[in-house]
Amino acid sequence: MAEKQYSAAQMVIDTLKNNGVEYVFGIPGAKIDYLFNALEDDDLELVVTRHEQNAAMIAQGIGRLTGKPGVAITTSGPGVSNLTTGLLTATSEGDPVLAIGGQVKRNDLLRLTHQSIDNASLLRSSTKYSAEVQDPESLSEVITNAMRTATSGKNGASFISIPQDVISSPVKADAISLCQKPHLGVPSEQEINEVIEAIKNSKFPVLLAGMRSSSQAETEAIRRLVQKTNLPVVETFQGAGVISRELENHFFGRVGLFRNQVGD
């Protein structure tokens, strides 16, 4: 008997569960049915609404009550466009929502086929974050980033468009969850000790030096940390120069461009 494959649809569900989602609201349709079929076999509570706007507004209510993104799922075409009022309201009023919409197959996107609208562009002005996923393996990361954006700064709505042949694909990547929400200001002694223990207990720790790391005080602190811990370091291009020549054995390149395999 062939081994059961891990599907993109199940990855979406596992990502939602990893991030504390208990309820999903929406209306099924052909371009998103793989996800609804997976929901039928899972313990997330699915509530089918009579209109996509209702799904978005109920999700907004969940977001307002819990502080976590309420989730609405719809099919392509009018299923997505009917979300607009609900998502715009959530963004305007500061309530976190994650909406997921179906889309035609990737090879149909430029053929002007039935319901092949540009979902992400349609909802960009109504949301804090709007994107379409082209790679099934990146689904969990994109959804997690969308949920982070929905609850960062002023809360609001995020939207993810998923083509039919993406949601139906097998995947190898694991579903991920949100990292701990960052705190502003000086960390407490307990928080510093927790970071120290996390570094000690990690198998493959890495230090990512980004945009704000290149000022003098931050650069000096990072260099002292690397000297003491021997952490490997990767940089964004805005963090270039943080690692000095005497620490070059700890430098593993830059991320984000040119497919630097070591850094990435």
Which role does the model predict for each range below?
Residues 2-264:
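N-terminal alpha/beta PP-like core and its mobile active-site loop of ThDP/TPP-dependent enzymes
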